[in-house]
Amino acid sequence: MATLKTLFSGFAALALIAGGSAIITLASATPVHAQLSSAKATVDAAKARGEIGEQVDGYLGVVTGKSPSTAVRNAMSEINIARKAVYTKAATGSGQPATVFAQLTGEKQINKSAQGTYVKDATGNWKKK
C-alpha cells in the first residue's frame, strides 16, 4: 500500500484541487478548470449545509434523507467525473485498478473534511465529522 501511495503522489502533472474536486495541468489553467472551480464552490456550500459529503470510495455522495438541488447534483456529478478521470489516469500503467487510487483519495478526503460535514464510512453509514 505504501508503494501505491508513493505512486499516486508521483503524478505531478495532475493535482486534486481543494478536496480533490478539480483536475488541472501544471502547464496552464483552462476554461474547464474555471467550470470545475464553479462546481467546487457549489459543492462546498452543499457540504456545509449537510446535503452531500465525501465517501470512502473517493467520490462525493448525497447524504441519506437529503434532497440537494439539481445544480448541486450537477456540480457533484461534474466533480465525480473529473475524479474518475484522475483515478483512471493514475491507474494506467500501474498494474492497479482505479478503485485503489479512488479509495486512497477517499481516505484522504475524509481526513481533510471540515468538522460538521458528513462523511460516509466503509460500513456505508453517514456520520457527522
Region annotations inferred by a language model:
Residues A2-I23:
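Bacterial N-terminal signal peptides that target proteins for export
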Residues T3, A12-A13, A27, V43, ...:
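Exposed boundary/loop context
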Residues A22-A34:
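Sec/Tat signal peptide C-region and signal peptidase I cleavage site
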Residues L36-N74, E78, S94-K129:
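Amphipathic, charged alpha-helical segments and their helix-to-coil junctions
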Residues A75-A91:
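Short, well-ordered alpha-helical segments
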